[in-house]
Amino acid sequence: MARIAGVNIPTNKRVVIALTYIYGIGLSLANRICEGCNIDHNVRVVNLSDDEIIRIRNFIRENYIVEGDLRKEVSMNIKFLTDIGCYRGLRHRRGLPVRGQRTHTNAKTRKGRSKLPVAAKKK
């Protein structure tokens, strides 16, 4: 298995698909990385040379924020919103949808299951 950005990417998949296993890299970004490194999109990770893997690794390190650094940045952004007390921060703190979705009938997963008392069985 090739190791890129601290993640073991699967060797039997195409390069574009394998790069999406890294947090912060989707399909469009994976295509851009392959174009930037001059690597064919359809080649499998098994068939990559060590030089090509090093090129991909360096390209990602120099141009993008991925994995732990990205997770830390996202959590710091959410912490900043909660600290300044803005509306989005309050919604994050309360565990409700942040971007204006309705909550009267939907948002069950974000709100969590309510603790309703279960009716006792009649004897």
From Swiss-Prot:
Any one of the GO CC terms: small ribosomal subunit
Source superkingdom: Bacteria
InterPro entries: Rbsml_uS13_C, Ribosomal_uS13, Ribosomal_uS13-like_H2TH, Ribosomal_uS13_bac-type, Ribosomal_uS13_CS
Region of interest called Disordered, as start-end residue ranges on this chain: 97-123
Key words, A-Z: Ribonucleoprotein, Ribosomal protein, RNA-binding, rRNA-binding, tRNA-binding
A GO molecular function held by the record: tRNA binding
Gene Ontology process terms (BP): translation
Similarity comment: Belongs to the universal ribosomal protein uS13 family.
Subunit note: Part of the 30S ribosomal subunit. Forms a loose heterodimer with protein S19. Forms two bridges to the 50S subunit in the 70S ribosome.
Task performed by this protein: Located at the top of the head of the 30S subunit, it contacts several helices of the 16S rRNA. In the 70S ribosome it contacts the 23S rRNA (bridge B1a) and protein L5 of the 50S subunit (bridge B1b), connecting the 2 subunits; these bridges are implicated in subunit movement. Contacts the tRNAs in the A and P-sites.
Protein name per the record: Small ribosomal subunit protein uS13
Phylogenetic placement of the source organism: Bacteria, Pseudomonadati, Pseudomonadota, Alphaproteobacteria, Rickettsiales
Gene: rpsM
